């Protein structure tokens, strides 16, 4: 599957704090060593930086550098089916003057935790949640599987109207 090459995990989440792990590999295909700044930011829905890691990296000529940055997010806005809040994790490579090189990949991030217990069932963010599931096939006549965004949104709204919270 295609991806940005940026991997985001949540090793620890609570109502008070979320620990965010951001991993990736930087590759230098140049014949010279690269001295760069790696900037990892967590942005809220307004684009405001709410957590950041900034450090210098050196990558040898025709070399690679694997990184893992750990960020702390205080009092995170938790994701849930009723409040599907998404942060955005942005990774930038900058030259020594601070100019952004190439692209700045962004990865959506929903901060949440869950647990499953035989007696208490499924909990999302510490609250019981009854999973109401359905299967969805993404096809419609005469489009086949080439659905527009509007068609996908309509399908999701129909599922939500049916009480589905798990697809």
Model-found features: residue ranges?
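Secreted/periplasmic carbohydrate-active enzymes, especially glycoside hydrolases
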Residues: 1-167
């Amino acid at each position: 599957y295609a991806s940005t090459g940026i991997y985001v995990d949540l090793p620890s989440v609570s109502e008070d704090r979320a620990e965010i792990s951001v991993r990736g590999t930087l590759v230098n295909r140049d014949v010279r060593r690269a001295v760069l700044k790696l900037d990892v930011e967590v942005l809220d829905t307004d684009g405001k930086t709410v957590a950041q890691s900034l450090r210098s990296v050196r990558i040898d000529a025709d070399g690679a550098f694997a990184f893992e940055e750990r960020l702390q997010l205080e009092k995170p806005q938790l994701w849930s089916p009723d409040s599907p809040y998404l942060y955005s994790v942005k990774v930038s490579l900058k030259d020594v003057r601070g100019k952004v090189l190439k692209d700045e990949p962004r990865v959506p991030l929903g901060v949440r935790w869950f647990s499953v217990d035989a007696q208490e069932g499924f909990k999302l963010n510490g609250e019981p949640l009854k999973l109401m599931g359905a299967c969805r096939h993404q096809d419609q006549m005469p489009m086949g599987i080439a659905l527009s965004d509007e068609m996908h949104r309509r399908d999701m709204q129909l599922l939500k109207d049916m009480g589905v919270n798990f697809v």
